[in-house]
Amino acid sequence: MAMFPLQSALLPDEDLPMQIFEPRYTALVRDCMRDDDPRFGVVLISQGREVGGGDVRCDVGTVARITECLDLAGSGRFMLRCRTGERIRVCDWLPDDPYPRAMVQAWPDEPGEPVTADQLEELEDRVMALFERIAAARNVLLPDRALVLGSDADTVDPGLRLYALASRVPIGPADRYSVLAAPSAAERLAALSDAVDSVAAVIEFQLSE
């Protein structure tokens, strides 16, 4: 699969707007657009940068499907709108030709301890409290819970709900990757819980200064 390493960790079911200008990635776009289902894999760069190569890449990512492609004629650039889908795991990195490529496999959630509705609600309460603390510090009104936490709060699959919740919390790439790379829903719950605690601690420290 064609791969696009990024400096952010994309979770399933997220929008991904992109401006493509580096020659190897414009080649990737052209190759993808020849398919009926244009898509590529996205993974987090653990070291290095997106431009120029020489990066060190993580091995867990998501599939990004191109939903809109605008060829900026004469500029050598593309504007893309993509939507991330299923989680993937890299089995083997192939030589860049000219863009990164890898053998990948779909990686659905592995069996584990069930995540209960009470556990999800408790985590959602903590996320809501986090946003309420930020809003109070900035003296702004917070939208209602459904808008803050997402209209997909009734999602039956706890693993998918945790992805959706994580996408709304202001956590960094490393924490987002921990959420993405958690093998099971229960481990994802633990990873996101730790990330929320870390963000809350940072915010309290900043507000105390």
Tell where the protein language model's regions lie, with residue ranges.
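N-terminal low-complexity, acidic/polar interaction/targeting segments
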Residues: M1-E209
